[in-house]
Amino acid sequence: MNVTVIGAGLAGSECAWQLAQRGIKVTLREMKPEKRTPAHTTDHFAELCCSNSLRSDQLENAVGLLKEELRRLGSLILQCAGETRVEAGGALAVDRHGFAALVTERIRTHPNITVVEGEVTDIPEGEVVVASGPLTSNALADRLRTLLGADSALHFYDAAAPLVSAGSVDLDLAWFGSRYDKGTADYINCPMNEEEYTAFWQALTTAQEAEVHGFEDQKVFEGCMPVEVMARRGRDTLCYGPLKPRGLRDPRTGKEPYAVVQLRRDNADGTVYNLVGFQTHLRFPEQKRVFSMIPALHSAEFLRYGVMHRNTFLDAPRLLDRYYRLKSQPRISFAGQMTGVEGYVESAASGFLVGVETARRLRGLPPVDFPRETAVGALGLYISNQSVTAFQPMNINFGIMPPLDHRVKGKRNKNAELSARSLEIIESVKEEVMA
């Protein structure tokens, strides 16, 4: 029994690992280092392009629940994330290079996985998992359009935030701390008063953008929206978004600033930080000019500027079932962001489910029933829900899971009970999943 997995991103790596752990031989096809997408900078697998954060690790948050489900079920991605973790308050953030290197090492040394480098331009025979990502190469994308139909693919634009060197941040004008003093002081907080913010906002909303080929319709995913696009929605929009000061008290004044830019550690050494929520596609000189208007970043050394790229995803409700299999050809499955799940953890979760269920099918076992009460199951049921009329990428959230059958006072308490319900189900199927 052999399965070909196309793409060694988070979804493809997780899928290949789950298959291999269950005795299935895997041929993992990866076009790097022969060819790279515009968003990739290394030859490692599971490269994190937009951010080094896997978001909240709290069970009162849906993505925190999804991570806990995957941890309990033996996820490679969550295991490697835990081993390369950097402090980020209540979030799970990783040293992105250490994380990708560790995933690559685990995959390359697994006896059941054979890595074949080079671009894939056609769908091979036999069992196939397409996890080529939202930046699928043109040749493979053309082949998929032929296979699935011209109207099978949709798209949006995604952006990444800049990185700065820690030593170039003026700590006389910033302080270390986490929101509400929760956890350890892992963020560098760069405050602005109203006058400074207004000047910054005016410069940001009038700065020159880079040309992005085919960007005429300007579809952007809300969760990764360029900061300049968000700023144009209104003068104080950013103050209720990535620059919100709530829970951050400037130790120099004892008060909440008008706006705060947060920098999050990007590597284990703490020498590189990313600007949280500052995905952008401004021209590079404009990024330097505008972002240096943030007082603490007046002399910032930019190690990488923000970039923007086009993401492609499938019209999944029409094409895929709840196990991410192609309805018209069940030998072909899809995993990752191209299925319409949005986010690193969600991509890994789809790869996990495809790997587990494909291995069970090849071994003559029935599928594991991950119900909608679980985050893993809810994602698969969302992307295959044919009643969705205008399908768009979706982060995991409690809204796509069934409500509790009783009232609970307070959102955090309600979410905690939703998570407890889910994890009880996960424990009940864990032995079956791990078989």
Question: Can you name each region flagged by the protein language model?
Answer:
Residues 347-368:
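Internal hydrophobic alpha-helix adjacent to the cofactor/substrate pocket in enzyme cavities
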Residues 106-284, 288-289:
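Predominantly flavin-linked oxidoreductase catalytic cores and closely associated redox partners
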Residues 275-341, 348-350, 368-385, 391-395, ...:
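A glycine-rich dinucleotide-binding beta-alpha-beta segment and adjacent secondary-structure elements
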Residues 1-11:
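Beta1/beta-strand and adjacent pyrophosphate-binding region of the FAD-binding site
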Residues 59-63, 67, 75-88, 148-157, ...:
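A short alpha-helix-loop-beta-strand transition element characteristic
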Residues 394-435:
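C-terminal auxiliary extensions adjacent to catalytic cores
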Residues 65-69, 73-113:
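N-terminal Rossmann-like dinucleotide/flavin-binding domain of flavoprotein oxidoreductases
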Residues 17-78, 372-383:
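N-terminal FAD cofactor-binding segment of flavoenzymes
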